[in-house]
């Protein structure tokens, strides 16, 4: 399982651990990923995703999974999230 957020595309970064004596050693900064279940209002279905805490706050701020995916760029989304977005768009098109 890769350490990449399925909604925002956040991935590990590299940098230095700097000691008090200014010694530098390489380290990785990992994203704060959580396994969550999000519910689509349009589809009435739940989806399990591995997303960062920041992405979870953004989903909540935008008003749910459907609203988040409507604004999200496809290149930042995982394959699974893109499929969910396509399903939601299809369901909204048939409902309209």
UniProtKB/Swiss-Prot annotation:
<dbReference type="InterPro" id="IPR037147">
    <property type="entry name" value="Ribosomal_bL28_sf"/>
</dbReference>
<dbReference type="InterPro" id="IPR026569">
    <property type="entry name" value="Ribosomal_bL28"/>
</dbReference>
<dbReference type="InterPro" id="IPR001383">
    <property type="entry name" value="Ribosomal_bL28_bact-type"/>
</dbReference>
<keyword id="KW-0689">Ribosomal protein</keyword>
<protein>
    <recommendedName>
        <fullName>Large ribosomal subunit protein bL28</fullName>
    </recommendedName>
</protein>
<dbReference type="GO" id="GO:0003735">
    <property type="term" value="F:structural constituent of ribosome"/>
</dbReference>
<dbReference type="GO" id="GO:0006412">
    <property type="term" value="P:translation"/>
</dbReference>
<dbReference type="GO" id="GO:0022625">
    <property type="term" value="C:cytosolic large ribosomal subunit"/>
</dbReference>
<comment type="similarity">
    <text>Belongs to the bacterial ribosomal protein bL28 family.</text>
</comment>
<dbReference type="InterPro" id="IPR034704">
    <property type="entry name" value="Ribosomal_bL28/bL31-like_sf"/>
</dbReference>
<dbReference type="Pfam" id="PF00830">
    <property type="entry name" value="Ribosomal_L28"/>
</dbReference>
<feature type="region of interest" description="Disordered">
    <location>
        <begin position="1"/>
        <end position="23"/>
    </location>
</feature>
<keyword id="KW-0687">Ribonucleoprotein</keyword>
């Amino acid at each position: 399982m890769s350490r990449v957020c399925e909604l925002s595309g956040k991935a590990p970064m590299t940098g230095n651990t700097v000691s008090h004596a200014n010694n530098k050693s390489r380290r990785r900064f990992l994203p704060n990923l959580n396994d969550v279940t999000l519910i689509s209002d349009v589809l009435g279905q739940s989806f399990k995703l591995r997303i960062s805490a920041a992405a979870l706050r953004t989903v909540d701020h935008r008003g749910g999974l459907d609203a988040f995916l409507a604004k999200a760029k496809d290149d930042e989304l995982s394959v699974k999230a893109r499929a969910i977005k396509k399903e939601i768009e299809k369901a909204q098109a048939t409902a309209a």
